[in-house]
């Protein structure tokens, strides 16, 4: 499937980019030039095209994640035709990827700190391709397992690295919108898997997946390492060059450079082992918020729905074809994240999480009722449309809130001192939850039936809503330094900025 995104369409697809890329802003006179002389008050234009390129490059890479997640649903329908594979082994085709992603999440933290964000991300392109080629050429289930493990490790690494890279390169005013692009393109990968999988068998679908890392690798060559990583390695001039590339040659970057340096100095001053400090009083709030969001993201059951969408429709006895239903869900998943990009910097993170929770709770309860009636031999033929309607609204709700926002906030709320280690912990925890949900999904259905499983997910969603209300801060419009200062100073919440700053550096 050929994807062409022209400059104008790209600008129009991201809220505020058109406005911010043309509006004039005044620079402050209180910041000094490198030679110590004060800046003159001048009119400059914000330069966002390079930030768009950086976000777009990472987002294309996120298609690998989505394709890996969406592969199972169409593949298992044809895999048992040409492979000698049992029902239990099929569950491992779905379960091995998140389990391996757990390992990737653990090793990804040290990698992004040692090698840098960019090199770590680019380094996954070749293994991704190797993993897909193993699956495509598999003559037994062991080769499929090996390919899924390799792809899974890469998924875990980039799941951690993408939000950190976005958080450290994009300006606060558009970080919400651009920060959701990786999730949007991840959903594109899921949609591609569903669409292409309706025409290709499991082997040829894997060949298709092997081609996705190529454009991602080429685009990442054009982008810089993050300024924050350079500063953490005392490579100040390279940090300045990177920031200049991201913000534009004629934009005042001195305040941002100064904030980066001060933040790093404070991190260096606190000293100590980053892992030991994860659960210190200073950093515990940010870590627990991140872990909580990851927990509720996965225990809503979304990956079980994505991995086994076709099977769920077969069980429902719905009049809607299971392959068509899977494609419709993929389309909704794809479109809804772009809706979120238009809303997140207007409504904020918390409002979208509220909407997300309510939508999922309502639809899971309704779909559970449908399966309960069917289980008790009550005729539900007249409601054959209900499973698709519920799952569409469920996926829509998830994709505008609990889908992208935990990953976005991973790059926002974790303090620089522990960012790599904490992101590694949160990512590993996320994929642990994903593995548990996907691997035990069929077992839970066997134990408490489909209606009980869906109602269990609904109760967990209620817990997620309460968690957001009482513990999750609003980060809209905040710089990373402001968020870190609030969360590490003992403040329970990060207050929302209702008015954007007049001066942007």
UniProtKB/Swiss-Prot annotation:
Q: In which tissues is it expressed?
A: Expressed in many larval tissues at a low level, moderate levels of expression are seen in testis and head and highest expression in muscle.
Keyword Cell membrane: yes or no? Answer: yes
State which residues carry a glycan (glycosylated). Answer: 80
Matching Gene3D superfamilies: MFS general substrate transporter like domains
A single GO cellular-component term from the record reads: plasma membrane
Location in the cell reads: Cell membrane
**Cytoplasmic topological domain:** 1-46, 113-124, 171-175, 223-286, 345-350, 412-419, 473-505
Pfam families hit by this protein: Sugar_tr
Q: Which UniProt keywords apply?
A: Cell membrane, Glycoprotein, Membrane, Sugar transport, Transmembrane, Transmembrane helix, Transport
Record's bilayer topology term = Multi-pass membrane protein
Q: Per the record, what ranges lie on the membrane's Extracellular side? A: 68-91, 146-149, 197-201, 308-323, 372-390, 438-451
The task this protein performs is described as:
High-capacity facilitative transporter for trehalose. Does not transport maltose, sucrose or lactose. Mediates the bidirectional transfer of trehalose. Responsible for the transport of trehalose synthesized in the fat body and the incorporation of trehalose into other tissues that require a carbon source, thereby regulating trehalose levels in the hemolymph.
Record-given protein name? Facilitated trehalose transporter Tret1
Question: Which species is this record about?
Answer: Bombyx mori (Silk moth)
């Amino acid at each position: 499937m050929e994807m062409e995104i022209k400059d104008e369409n790209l600008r129009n697809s991201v809220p505020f980019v058109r406005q911010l890329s043309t509006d004039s802003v005044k620079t402050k006179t209180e910041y000094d030039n490198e030679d110590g002389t004060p800046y003159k008050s001048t009119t400059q234009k914000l330069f966002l095209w390079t930030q768009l390129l950086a976000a777009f490059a990472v987002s294309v890479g996120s298609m690998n994640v989505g394709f890996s997640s969406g592969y199972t649903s169409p593949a298992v329908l044809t895999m048992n035709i040409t492979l000698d594979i049992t029902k239990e082994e099929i569950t491992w085709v779905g379960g091995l990827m998140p389990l391996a992603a757990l390992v990737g999440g653990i090793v990804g933290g040290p990698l992004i700190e040692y090698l840098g964000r960019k090199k770590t991300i680019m380094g996954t392109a070749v293994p991704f391709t190797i993993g897909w080629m193993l699956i495509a050429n598999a003559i037994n289930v062991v080769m499929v397992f090996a390919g899924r493990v390799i792809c899974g490790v890469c998924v875990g690494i980039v799941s951690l690295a993408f939000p950190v890279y976005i958080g450290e390169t994009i300006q606060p005013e558009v970080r919400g919108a651009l920060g959701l692009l990786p999730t949007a393109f991840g959903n594109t990968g899921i949609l591609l898997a569903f669409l292409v999988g309706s025409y290709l068998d499991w082997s040829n679908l894997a060949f298709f997946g092997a081609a996705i890392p190529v454009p991602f690798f080429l685009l990442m060559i054009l982008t810089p390492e993050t300024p924050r990583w350079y500063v953490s390695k005392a490579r100040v001039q390279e940090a300045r060059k990177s920031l200049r590339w991201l913000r534009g040659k004629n934009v005042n970057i001195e305040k941002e450079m100064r904030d980066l340096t001060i933040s790093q100095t404070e991190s260096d001053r606190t000293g100590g082992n980053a892992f030991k400090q994860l659960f210190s009083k200073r950093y515990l709030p940010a870590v627990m918020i991140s872990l909580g969001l990851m927990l509720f993201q996965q225990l809503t059951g979304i990956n079980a729905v994505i991995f086994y969408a076709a099977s769920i429709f077969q069980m429902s006895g719905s009049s809607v074809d299971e392959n068509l239903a899977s494609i419709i869900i993929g389309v909704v998943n794809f479109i809804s994240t772009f809706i979120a990009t238009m809303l997140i910097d207007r409504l904020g993170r918390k409002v979208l999480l509220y909407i997300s929770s309510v939508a999922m709770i309502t639809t899971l309860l309704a779909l559970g009722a449908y399966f309960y009636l069917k289980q008790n031999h009550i005729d539900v033929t007249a409601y054959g449309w209900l499973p698709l309607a519920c799952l569409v609204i469920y996926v829509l709700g998830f994709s505008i809130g609990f889908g992208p926002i935990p990953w976005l906030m991973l790059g926002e709320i974790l303090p620089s001192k522990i960012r790599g280690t904490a992101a590694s912990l949160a990512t590993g925890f996320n994929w642990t939850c994903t593995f548990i949900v996907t691997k035990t999904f069929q077992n839970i259905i066997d134990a408490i039936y489909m209606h009980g499983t869906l109602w269990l997910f609904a109760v967990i969603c209620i817990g997620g809503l309460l968690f957001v209300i009482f513990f999750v801060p609003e980060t809209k419009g905040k710089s990373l330094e402001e968020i870190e200062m609030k969360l590490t100073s003992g403040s329970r919440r990060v207050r929302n900025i209702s008015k954007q700053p007049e001066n942007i550096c």
